[in-house]
Amino acid sequence: TDLPSLSEVMTVVEPLGLVVTDIEILRLHYAETLRQWRERFMKNRDEAVKIYDERFCRMWELYFVICELGFRHQNLMVFQLQLAKNLDAVPLTRDYMIDWERRRAVEEGAKRQYAA
């Protein structure tokens, strides 16, 4: 099956009465993710062959390469939608996301400090 385009997703979302409050287009992010997954897989390939088999490993190598090439060169992309029931459900800018990430980083740092 094909990955749905943004317009195809929107035709399903719109009749639900949901409002799109944010869209993020992650252009080459998934290609990079697939590349890194493939590198990690290859570093552990011998172990994977022992657990599964050679056919399994070849299948995953092929999957990682084909998918990475598709996302890198064939205009495939991942997009994230933020949907809400109300237009004013989230702030007007993404600043609240940054503030949340900062608070989370501080909390994680404190947890590590006290765990040591």
Where are these regions (language model features)?
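Substrate-binding/catalytic lobe of Class I Rossmann-like enzymes that use SAM or dcSAM, i.e.
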Residues: 1-89
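Short, cationic low-complexity segments
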Residues: 95-116
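Hydrophobic positions on the alpha-helical face of helix-turn-helix-like DNA-binding modules
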Residues: 92
